[in-house]
Amino acid sequence: MTKGRNCSLDYMLNKDWTKNTLRIDKDVLYVVGGLYGNNFALELINSKAEKENAQIIFNGDMHWFDINKDDFLTVENNSIKGIKLLGNVEYELINSKDNLGCGCNYPEDVSEGIVERSNAIHQMMKDNLG
């Protein structure tokens, strides 16, 4: 396996995943994917969700450009009312195997430089949080 070119089989859902579902009793649902640590966008999402009494679900990859611990924690604290699902970024932060880098699963036509940079960003984030 090559760091940044593969993702973990652990990302796959268990075949019985629907047996443990959560019912959401809201008229409005925001599904936010790929926030990538953008706290300005998060503030806007929170403001709109508050006005509409919406439930927010963060569909993974909440973090990326919030590489510094304080920025990371700001995003975490400002998303506390939402339901958080793990994306590859979050999963690989807590993965003790540390063999997949960012877990981005870049295809072969993506340059090695991009893959290396993504792995370096992810490793810096992991180091800063450690």
What kind of region is each of these model predictions?
Residues 1-78:
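N-terminal active-site segment of His-dependent metallophosphoesterases
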